[in-house]
Regions:
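C-terminal catalytic/motor cores of large multi-domain enzyme assemblies
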Residues: 1-190
Length: 190
């Protein structure tokens, strides 16, 4: 199999969440607001911290380890057809508890929902969007070439949502069921 898309497998599993609902309700009674999203992010961070082999990537046939746990997510600033979307990349150590992850996730979403706020990913995307198409193709190919050679500047890696351990997005607010997304052939996201 030459590409990631050749090797992907789709799988659906229904999991009973009665105990999880009870836990979320109990914490709500204590004044702590948890969501399914916070629980899923916490579980993923814990899983990656306990199974570091899941935080590896392959570039040019060489297996490498990430220097931290990063989870990217898309945030719709306004729930309308014209609403602007932003992407953020959250860093984790793997030592955070569910409440710390919940706070980080909630504050990041609130901060990035404001149309006045721009993060590093937004700034990079803005620069690229102002570039003529012929130059954009050259820049993207140059970025991928530098990335493949391990020469991409750290500032671009830090701004890139695709240099991440996982990319998770909550689509519940859109009123749709879970989706299966293609794998990215570029960069280092799985």
């Amino acid at each position: 199999m030459k590409t990631r898309n050749d090797a992907q497998v789709y799988y659906t599993e229904d999991i009973p969440i009665t105990a999880l609902d009870e836990y979320i309700d109990k914490k709500a009674d204590e004044g702590i607001k948890l969501s399914y999203m916070s629980v899923i992010y916490s579980a993923l961070v814990k899983l990656i911290s306990q199974r570091p082999q899941l935080n590896r990537f392959i570039m040019n046939g060489i297996t490498s380890e990430r220097t931290g746990i990063y989870i990217s997510l898309a945030i719709k600033k306004d729930l309308s057809d014209e609403g602007i979307e932003t992407i953020v990349k959250l860093p984790f150590t793997g030592n955070e508890n569910i409440f710390e992850i919940n706070n980080k996730l909630s504050s990041t979403i609130i901060q990035n929902k404001s149309n006045a706020n721009s993060n590093e990913t937004d700034k990079l995307a803005k620069i690229l969007s102002l570039t003529p198409n012929w130059l954009l193709k050259f820049l993207v190919n140059s970025i991928m070439f530098l990335d493949n050679g391990g020469l991409l500047p750290k500032s671009i890696i830090n701004a890139s949502p695709f240099h991440t351990s996982a990319f998770l997005t909550n689509v519940a607010s859109l009123g749709i069921d879970s989706i299966y997304h293609h794998l990215y052939e570029c960069n280092k996201v799985f």
